[in-house]
Each structure stands twice: as C-alpha cells, then as structure tokens.
C-alpha cells in the first residue's frame, strides 16, 4: 500500500508541481538578461558589439533556456534521489518513474521554458524593472495550478497522452510567441 502511495506521488502529483520550476528559473534569467542590462546601463555596450540584434536575441534566449533546463534537471535528480531513498527506507523496494517523466523532461520542460522566456521578453520592452518583467511571466503558472488542482480532485489525470498533447500545443505556442518576441526585439525598443 505504501509503495502505491509513493508511486501515485511520484508519477501523478509531482509532475504538475515540477512544471513550475522551468517557468520560474527561465523567467528570472530572461528578465535579468533583458531588463537587467537596461537597468544597469550595460545594454548600450552590448549593442555596440559586432553581433547582430538577431544573434543577441538568440543568445539571450539560449542562455535563459540553458539555465531553466539545468535547474530542472538538477531538481529532478534531487527529487528522485530523495524520493527513492525514502521509498527504499520505508518499503525496502525501489520505485521507477513512469515514462511520463521522459516526456516532461525532454518535451514539456523546454517548451514551457521557452514560453516563459517569450512572455518575459515581450513584457520586458514595457517593463521598467526586472521584478516587473518577472511578474508578467507568473501568469503562466495559473494553468499549472489548475492542473495541480485537477490532479488532486481527480478531474484531470496526468498520463502520457495528455502530456504529448500538452507538449505539442506548447511547442506550437512557443513558435508563435518567439516570432512575436523577436519582432519586439529592436534597437529602438531596447533603448527606450
């Protein structure tokens, strides 16, 4: 019975909570990268570099994505280590994560990180501070909270099919958001 409860926690409850990590890490990095440089007046120096505005945009996006993914993977390893140690201590058995975790780590985490970065970049043109840019990306957490509530009430059950669908929708949304964010990344908007 205990092992079933641990399996439920690992494979059904933790994924919904886990999706918040890349949103938070990526949006903090993106806000610091875009708005933070304008606040510290280091953006002008960067714009004098031989890189094009498109290359600067891509580098900042990749930096935010890399930080989000590193934080996600380290958090996943720590969570798995702690949960496995507890399951082993209490039941004497090991617990394997479901295949859903593979979809989450390889498809949904990068997609949700890119969505957070795109929202942060779009809002950074209007934001006056890093905190203001970060606060706008918080709205991405609301659907995750709805997913958590759905999990606890039994309305939504996370499974591989739902995760694949969510991943495809997020990837399509990312393409649209990134196109819009790239369009708002101009010299005039950055310096104003």
Report each predicted region and the residues it spans.
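A structural motif at transmembrane helix-loop-helix junctions in multipass membrane proteins
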Residues: 31-33, 92-141
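Membrane-interfacial helix-loop-helix connectors in multipass membrane proteins
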Residues: 1-8, 77-106, 158
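Selective transmembrane-helix segments that form parts of the transport pathway or gating/packing helices
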Residues: 21, 26, 53-80
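Long, hydrophobic alpha-helical segments
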Residues: 9-31
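Extracellular/periplasmic helix-loop-helix junctions in multi-pass membrane proteins
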Residues: 128-135, 149-168
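Junction motif at the cytosolic side of a transmembrane helix
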Residues: 126, 172-192
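Transmembrane helix boundary and interhelical loop/hinge segments in multi-pass membrane proteins
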Residues: 26-47
């Amino acid at each position: 019975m205990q092992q079933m409860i641990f399996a439920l926690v690992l494979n059904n409850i933790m994924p919904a909570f886990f999706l918040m990590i890349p949103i938070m890490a990526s949006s903090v990095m993106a806000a610091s990268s875009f708005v933070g440089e304008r606040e510290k007046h280091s953006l002008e120096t960067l714009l004098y570099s031989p890189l094009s505005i498109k290359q600067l945009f891509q580098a900042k996006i990749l930096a935010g994505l890399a930080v989000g993914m590193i934080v996600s993977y380290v958090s996943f390893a720590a969570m798995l280590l702690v949960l496995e140690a507890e399951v082993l201590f209490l039941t004497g058995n090991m617990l394997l994560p479901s295949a859903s975790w593979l979809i989450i780590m390889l498809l949904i985490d990068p997609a949700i990180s890119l969505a957070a970065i795109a929202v942060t970049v779009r809002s950074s043109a209007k934001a006056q501070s890093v905190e203001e840019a970060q606060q706008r990306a918080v709205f991405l957490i609301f659907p995750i909270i709805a997913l958590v509530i759905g999990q606890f009430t039994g309305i939504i059950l996370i499974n591989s099919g739902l995760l694949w669908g969510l991943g495809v929708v997020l990837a399509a949304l990312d393409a649209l958001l990134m196109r819009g964010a790239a369009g708002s990344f101009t010299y005039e908007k950055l310096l104003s």
